[in-house]
Structure formats: C-alpha cells, structure tokens
Swiss-Prot record:
Gene name tied to this protein: purH
NCBIfam families for this protein: PRK00881.1, purH
Entry GO terms, CC: cytosol
Species this chain originates from: Streptococcus pyogenes serotype M12 (strain MGAS2096)
Name assigned to this protein: Bifunctional purine biosynthesis protein PurH
Domain MGS-like, chain residue ranges per copy: 1-145
Keywords, comma-separated and alphabetical: Hydrolase, Multifunctional enzyme, Purine biosynthesis, Transferase
Amino acid sequence: MTKRALISVSDKSGIVDFAKELKNLGWDIISTGGTKVALDNAGVETIAIDDVTGFPEMMDGRVKTLHPNIHGGLLARRDADSHLQAAKDNNIELIDLVVVNLYPFKETILRPDITYDLAVENIDIGGPSMLRSAAKNHASVTVVVDPADYATVLGELADAGQTTFETRQRLAAKVFRHTAAYDALIAEYFTTQVGEAKPEKLTITYDLKQAMRYGENPQQDADFYQKALPTDYSIASAKQLNGKELSFNNIRDADAAIRIIRDFKDRPTVVVLKHMNPCGIGQADDIETAWDYAYEADPVSIFGGIVVLNREVDAATAKKMHPIFLEIIIAPSYSEEALAILTNKKKNLRILELPFDAQAASEVEAEYTGVVGGLLVQNQDVVAENPSDWQVVTDRQPTEQEATALEFAWKAIKYVKSNGIIITNDHMTLGLGAGQTNRVGSVKIAIEQAKDHLDGAVLASDAFFPFADNIEEIAAAGIKAIIQPGGSVRDQDSIDAANKHGLTMIFTGVRHFRH
C-alpha cells in the first residue's frame, strides 16, 4: 500500500526538496492552499485536500482539514482491528506522515501595524489539530513541525522505509511543546487585550537561547531561555561584539546592571557590579569622568566586574578601562576607536551593545521568582518617586548639595541587597553594606568602606531603621544626612537621635527591599 503524507506549511523553507524526496521514495502527498500551489509549481504532484474530504476549502480557509477523513486517517491505531475496520467502512485512507507548521501568530502580533482582527485571523485551528492528532498516534504516524527535522526523517525513510519509534516519540514531544507554546502566546495576547491582571492560569513560553556549560556552580546544569515575544532592552537581545559566551552568572549580573542604569538617565553614568550588587556608581558631565568616579568608588572590587555605561564609549574612556580585568562591558554604542582599543589582546572580554531607547518598555514586564513547587509574580520596583513628596523629619533641612547627594543615594540603594546601606556624595558611591541580617551591621560595613571619604557624604537605607543605634553609628562617623523610607514603630527614636546630633533626615515613604 502506498504511504501518504499530508503537507501544509506556512514556513515553506526546504519543503519543495523534502516533498520531492518523498515522491522519489514512492509516497503520495496531500496538500492544502498555498503549500499545494508551491509544490505544484515546483513540479511535485499532490492530491488536493478537498479530494480527500469531499468538501471544498471554505470560509476564507478557516475550514479545510477539520474532517473525519483527515483525522480518522491520522488517529486510527494500526494495531487495533476495530480502528482499521472503521476506516475501511468509512472509506478513510490512512495518513502516515504529517508535515505542518502554523500560521505566524507571533510574527503577526509583533508587526507595528497589527490590528485585533488581523491577530485573530492568524490563529491557526486546523494546523494544531492535525499536529496533535498525529502526535497522539506517534506509535504509527510521523509528525514534523520543524524544518530542521526534515533531513532526519528523510534519512530514516530512505534507509528503512519508516522512521523509528524513538524518532516519532521525540518528534511528538516537540509537537506538543510547539502547540503548547503557540497556545500560550495566544492566551497571553488575549489576556493583555482584556486587561486581566491576575489570570487564574499562568502559562508563559520561552525559546531556548543558549545551552550553558553549567549554572551558578559547576555541579548545576543550566540553560538560558528568551521570551517568545522578545524584549528589546534585555541581555537576551543584546548584540555581543567580542568575547566568550556569557555564563549563567554573567547573565544575572548583566541583567542587574541594565536594571540599575535605567534609573540614571539624565547624566552620563557608569555602574560597576559584582555579584548583582553595585560596587561603584559614578555620574558626571561626560562618560570618561563618570568612569573615573565609578572606578574610584571601589578600585579593588572592580576586578572581574561588570560595567554598564549609559552613553557611547569613547576612546578616552576605553583607554582607561582596557588595563583592568573586566568580565563584561555593556553600552548603547562604541566608537570605532574605542572598540579597537577594548578588543586589543582582550579576546575573552565580553562586549555587549544594547539599545537604551527601549528601556521604558522593559519596566512593565513582570518579575518571576521560582520557589519549590511554585512561582512568585510581581511587577518591578520601578515606582516613580518625586522628591517633592518626601518629608524632612528632622529640625535641620538638607543643604542643596546634600539634597542632590541624597537623591543620587536613593536611586543607588534600590539595587543593593537587603539589608542594604549605601554611602555616597553627589556624584559617586563611597561605601556599601549589603546583605547583612541586621541593619546596623550593614551600616558599619558601609562606613568602614567609606571611612576616608566621609566629608560631605550622605547615607541611604533601603528600609527603615528599627532602632536608634543605627543613627548613633552614622553620627559617630561624621555623616550628616540620611535618607530612608521610615515606617518603624520606633521612628521617633531615630528622629530624636538625628536631632541630637544635628543630622538631617528624609523619609521617602517607599521601601526598596531586594532579596
């Protein structure tokens, strides 16, 4: 009995050659619509779908393959006599191979001129149905959704006249992943259209971006996936201009870096990170000076760090960066001379180019945190804060210079691991206390780091001070200005201590925990 294949594809790459080889192997080919036209024009003889169903394609192509003569031919178990008899009684011929890929829903909704009606029309119904029927019956039917699998299938058919069960099972699994991802995108689109903020089911889909050597540690397996609807301002979308493949830890650090730099749009700014904590932030009127400040903030921790700059990297800045061992540099662009300097004898230095004009769109994405047996979802900590809404709670008001420095410190503290303390002046960070289990411990660490640069320095805390001992430590170090959220039941104790030492202190009313 001649074997039959059904081919209906929107992505026609490689399909003509595939179909020609099938014909050479003695297969009959059923086809639909544009696929049939393409194959016929290439001289590949095909059977029209309506010759199989007895019904013409109708309703602008919405109905063409949803028919028992198709799905019966796909779903009939070859090892079940009752199935084969039912097929014979109803003149249903078996279909042994399905090659289908789906309407380009993803590509459609990414179009700038997308309309709701156009999106709806690009929801494939018949394609997923055929794929699922064939995949369910993979014991007997081979199903192909990816042109990358054409060669494997043809090779096995040529060698043995059929594919192996292992291949059919692997291809079926691929189909179910594919249709699940396809439906997830449709669900995501409609959920957005109706404004549902807390859907009762959450299905998200990502595409494999990079198979990684290992994860956070060598004993951990890891891979990097990118959103099926890519975010332009994302490490996954960055263009790598030089260097080794990004590691798991590189990607996490780089992601933290591009989040931080979003908050420093107004002036040229450089941020240096280690282990997802900023160890140096500098801002100035030009990017070279901003680099100087970021480097001076912690010239020890910068070794092996990640650097992000919010302006084009020029030659002068590149010359200063080049001698230092860095893991990654990220910037919106690089001058030709700067790139030549940075790559000279630095084949491993990872240099990434990222369009910063897409920053705002990245801020609306939800954050997902995996826990054992569950998933936490929250919006990003990107609340717009207006300093005019802040409250000076002490007798002394901040000076103009202190006010500027406090605003700078408040931007920086958002990205320090809790309990987080940061000491800055108005243009660079000076000391950092991160990740301590008590706040006074973070205060002491930050002061120790900044001890030689405390003249005119200010201090920011990501959350309230639970006790006045923090204020005593700060005052003893000579720091005169503090910014914190407030909100402790003992706030008045901290205010009284600040007044006793002549400090100025601002309450913002907004906490910035980071775990």
